């Protein structure tokens, strides 16, 4: 099989099984570095690879899983020597069978900041060294596997995309509760890895076929039907007596049968599996075609532990923005990060689902500050972030350190803006907000704004950004100054939803600027926009009236099934009118009591 045929197979292909399992059976001593055997005993390693290829593995992983500077510290061999020998051994073994050789890459063995001490860019540099050595040695593809930290996987994927041209398979290990050891969800993994350029996503290790299946099903549902998905389960669970794993090759093959319904790109085994396990999978997946029926992809924004599916109205907190706020501007100039973090925490507590982040203020270094604020925010909140800036460098620095899949606010219809912002969003897997404005300014007519939105949408699609990640802002104009254009915004929003199939966003509070009792206008305009199809409402989540409108709307449109969220939020609250009546009724009684006491 040629590399360019990898994702064009008409049948689910087989991966290999456990390397450590085979080496332990061959007498590998506890604490020894398996990767050094690439040089000290190449015949042993080559023989294991050949057994897997003979069993039907079309992709065989080189013995390079632990080849990192940290894990090889003190070795007599360099990282490059071990990787080169590992790739060459695997290629020799695979050649007679037409199997491909994968550079197998695992976690570095050090925790990244903020959980550990390894800086993100140092991790990227370490992975760059690994993948460049693998490509130079002749690897056909890169196989990142057994990751539990999404941030480390991001570092690995960036290194591979920036330094090689090899196809990339990316896999994480999930526990029985459906999250990795660090709390990452299946959906956050899928959205982030796909966005960063992985060519296939999968699940390996930790559990057996039966336990992994529900998570594999979620993974398949979280990516397009034609996007490759794979699995490499363990041979069940380790036996208590340390004598191996509790699933036989025959039972493993039987438990893998339900995976046929997922139409996987590939399947194999991990810890405890051997060539016999892989050989039996030939029958399990005989005639199984990869690829699932097309389905409408949700728009997902995420951090590792919090996956927000934008399906209907979603609240974006607007308060992390210094515009018109002297205290906020002062905090940014003084580096008062606590003030910024307080805004994040209070909005999260009020019910925001996403946080807008704008740090553009006079007298600050916006790119440096954006990076610092993104890192700081992700240390105190799990909510996804909307990076809000017109400064390309600030967006680039924020996107690079962000852990998960963010949204960028914004670009517009100007060609130079599109050319600057869209490639950034593509590289870092971010969703994009497009303002329906161009070099000619804001158009008063809805049709003209839709025309600009169409150009933005076409440019984003051409840049490789999926339609579900395109958001159009039809621009909220102030009712005090441009009252006649208010309805045009709502009309344009509705047309963008129907004609372009994109998501929509509005800065709701702009509508009331300069007018009294702003909450009345904001809430009414929000309701109009929701009815027209608004997806992201950039607003103040501390506004009880606006949040009530959102929750009530979700009940009345059947999005909040059984009114579960509405009841949870409002069951214990007393309406303002009732509270006033109760206070008025209590007042005379209180006065009478005071009189009696005197």
Give the label of every model feature segment.
Residues 1-473, 477-598:
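Domain-level signal for soluble alpha/beta catalytic cores
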């Amino acid at each position: 099989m040629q590399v360019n045929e990898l994702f064009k197979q008409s049948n689910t292909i087989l991966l290999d099984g456990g390397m450590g399992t085979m080496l332990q059976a061959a007498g590998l001593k506890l604490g020894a570095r398996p990767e050094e055997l690439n040089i000290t005993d190449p015949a042993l390693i080559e023989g294991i690879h050949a057994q897997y290829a003979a069993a039907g593995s079309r992709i065989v992983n080189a013995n390079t899983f632990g080849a990192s500077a940290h894990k090889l510290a003190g070795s007599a061999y360099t990282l490059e020597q071990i990787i080169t020998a590992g790739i060459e051994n695997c290629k020799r073994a695979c050649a007679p069978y037409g199997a491909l050789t994968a550079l197998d890459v695992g976690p570095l063995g050090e925790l990244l900041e903020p959980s550990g001490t390894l800086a993100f860019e140092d991790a990227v540099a370490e992975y760059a060294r690994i993948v460049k050595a693998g490509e130079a040695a002749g690897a056909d593809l890169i196989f990142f596997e057994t990751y539990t930290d999404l941030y480390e996987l991001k570092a690995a994927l960036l290194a591979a995309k920036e330094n090689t041209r090899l196809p990339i398979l990316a896999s994480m290990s999930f526990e029985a509760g459906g999250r990795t050891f660090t709390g990452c969800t299946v959906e956050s993994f899928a959205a982030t890895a796909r966005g960063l350029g992985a060519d296939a996503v999968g699940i390996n290790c930790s559990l057996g076929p039966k336990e992994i299946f529900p998570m594999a099903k979620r993974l398949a549902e979280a990516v397009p039907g034609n996007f490759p998905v794979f699995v490499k389960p363990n041979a069940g669970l380790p036996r208590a007596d340390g004598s191996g794993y509790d699933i036989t090759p025959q039972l493993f093959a039987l438990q893998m049968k339900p995976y046929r319904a997922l139409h996987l790109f590939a399947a194999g085994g991990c810890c405890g599996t051997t060539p016999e396990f892989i050989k039996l999978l030939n029958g399990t997946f005989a005639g199984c075609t990869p690829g699932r029926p097309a389905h409408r992809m949700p728009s997902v924004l995420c951090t590792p532990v919090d996956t927000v599916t934008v399906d209907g109205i979603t609240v974006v907190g607007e308060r992390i923005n210094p515009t018109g706020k002297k205290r906020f501007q002062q905090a940014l100039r003084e580096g008062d990060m606590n003030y910024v973090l307080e805004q994040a925490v209070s909005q999260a507590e009020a019910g925001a689902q996403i946080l807008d982040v704008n740090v553009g203020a006079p007298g600050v270094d916006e790119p440096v500050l954006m990076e610092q604020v993104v890192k700081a925010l992700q240390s105190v909140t799990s909510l996804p972030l909307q990076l809000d800036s017109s400064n390309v460098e600030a967006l680039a620095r924020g996107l690079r350190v962000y852990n998960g899949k963010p949204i960028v606010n914004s670009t517009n219809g100007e060609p130079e803006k599109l050319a600057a912002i869209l490639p950034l969003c593509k590289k870092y897997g971010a969703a994009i907000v497009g303002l329906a404005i161009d070099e000619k300014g804001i158009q008063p007519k809805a049709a003209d704004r839709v025309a600009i939105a169409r150009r933005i949408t076409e440019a984003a699609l051409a840049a490789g950004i999926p339609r579900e990640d395109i958001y159009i802002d039809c621009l909220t104009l102030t009712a005090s100054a441009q009252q006649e254009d208010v309805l045009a915004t709502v009309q344009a929003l509705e047309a963008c939803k129907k004609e372009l199939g994109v998501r929509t966003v509005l800065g709701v509070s702009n509508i009331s600027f300069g007018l009294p009792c702003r909450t009345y206008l904001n809430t009414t305009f929000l309701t109009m926009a929701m009815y027209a199809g608004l997806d992201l409402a950039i607003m103040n989540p501390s506004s009880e009236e606006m949040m009530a409108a959102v929750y009530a709307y979700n009940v009345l449109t059947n999005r909040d099934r059984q009114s579960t969220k509405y009841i949870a939020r409002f069951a214990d609250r007393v309406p303002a009118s009732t509270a006033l009546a109760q206070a008025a009724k209590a007042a005379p009684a209180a006065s009478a009591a005071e009189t009696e006491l005197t």
